[in-house]
Amino acid sequence: MKKTALITGGSSGLGFVFAEELGKQEYNVIILARDPVKIDHAIASLKEKGITATGISCDISNENQLKNAFDAVKSQETKIDFLILNAGMVIPQLLSDYTETSVIRKQLDTNLCGTIMTAWQFLPLLQKGSKILITSSGFGLMGAAGYTLYCATKAGLINFGEALRRELLCKGINVYVSCPGDMDTPQFREEIRTSPDWMKTGSPRKTQAADQEGRKILSQCKGKMKFLILPASDVKLLVIVSKVLPRKIRDYLLDRMFPQPIAK
């Protein structure tokens, strides 16, 4: 019997890579994403490759839509073998430049609260041997100007994942958190396009191919001892530097590695 993978944010970027790779491994794939047009395109592309896939339009920050998505999956009498919590958003902007609290709330609700609510909602469909993968970020391991909300939510996901892992060990469900670096995805290209000018100073940010990073991440979702997955070499270096160097030196180096705004 085929296994089933449910992937939030699976219609494009890293999420679509996960869908495609797991489909090749004979998983039935269920995609949750906001945009019905993107979902249809993703499903058609997967089916062209012989992958069994379905899609559900769902904004994970909306509790009613999330409940409806759960009911739709449950009605198929399907157990979830791999739950991938990948949906997220980023707005590169100084905290002081936000003019509406609704925009702040949307990022918190999507990246952090929505991910937690999705995990809570679909936990009843997981069983012994199931896996959960949460997509955090290298920015979940440090703070960068222009990413106050993104860094806060991604850091929260790391601690959430660690706590959830310990809660589910007794049930034989493994939890992993990946912290990828910059990847060449539609979301990253839009992020760069909308970044304020001060963030575009210095050398262009180095990106990794999403398909390569996705395969690396999935290949490491094995065993109960593994938890934090760092597919990018620059993120691994950040972790090593943070452990080895005194905090003062670490901050000195990071302050000079990343752009900083000019005082107004």
Q: Where does each model-flagged region fall?
A:
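Conserved glycine-rich cofactor-binding loop
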Residues: 11-12
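Residue(s) in the substrate-gating loop at a strand-loop-helix junction
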Residues: 137
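Active-site helix of classical SDR
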Residues: 119, 153
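Conserved glycine-rich Rossmann-like NAD(P)H-binding loop of the short-chain dehydrogenase/reductase
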Residues: 27-41
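The beta1-alpha1 cofactor-binding region of Rossmann-like NAD(H)/NADP(H)-dependent oxidoreductases
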Residues: 36, 57-68
